[in-house]
Amino acid sequence: YPAQAGQAARVTYRAAMTAEPPLPPVAFSVPGIAVENAKPAPGRYPLVVLSHGYGNVTAALSWLTENLASKGYVVAAIRHDDPDIADRAKFVGPLINRPRDIAFAAASLRKQLPDLIDPTRTALIGYSMGGYGGLTVAGAAIDPAGMLAKGVPGGELVTLARNPAALQVAGLKAVVAISPFGGNGLDIWGSDGLAGVSVPLLFIAGNRDKVVGYDKGAAGFFAATPRADRYLLTFREAGHSIGLNPAPAEMTSTLWDFDWFEDAVWRKRRINAINQHFITAFLARTLRGEAAMSAYLDVPVVNS
């Protein structure tokens, strides 16, 4: 959040991510520019709730969280309690919990910080599994007859699909979905569930994404959301790893660790800078009503 930090010491983020089995998780640190428990700057600000990918951590998204906070937003990055990605039997947990976590966090923060957050202006940003969660909360209807919904033990995903009101976020004005999960043959929203989304959308993806797909991922979702004012930013030849920080030094020893963070074609700092540019313009227009920001979104050429 915007703060009066002065010369106080800046934070260092510490986390760990899954290593290639059977190795233990790899711990790493990321230097930040935020100040822990700093006094908030006066005023009420739009809320941005950020949801990381399956097996990711919030520290790996500081390139975006701190950047947005410095531009006048209250940014809350959820630390999801994901199971080990190697345990495929527990994969269904995030499918159920991502939308619930996002809706719960947004509602709780508005109640806890009424003097800091403007409850009428909220945006969701999600990477990979977080993108699925954000789109679902925004109105994408899970198909109760779909393969994934029927395959979740106990029918919990079917129950979630039949109670969309439980996921609604008041004051929702925009969603940014980076490499969003949900398509690529899984079709969690069925043939027309995405048509329920009407808030402005910004999809960001690499067209060589082998994890969640592109034609049946972000590009397909873009085509399936006709009610929304929407944009699609594509990194040509990029894969799935376009949503995190540059790889910390501790995550460069093995290809598995490095692959969490880095793309095979694009420099990560270049990716982050481009994403910051478009996300900044998109949120300024949708959350602050700054019409002049459209000039940064409506680019003069499709391929550049």
Features from the language model and the residues they span:
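The conserved beta1-alpha1 loop
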Residues: P46-G53, A205-G206
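Alpha/beta-hydrolase active-site loop
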Residues: A60-W63, N67, K90-T120, L124, ...
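Catalytic active-site module of serine/aspartate enzymes centered on a nucleophile-bearing elbow/loop
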Residues: E250-S304
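Active-site-adjacent alpha-helix of alpha/beta-hydrolase-fold enzymes
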Residues: D192-N272
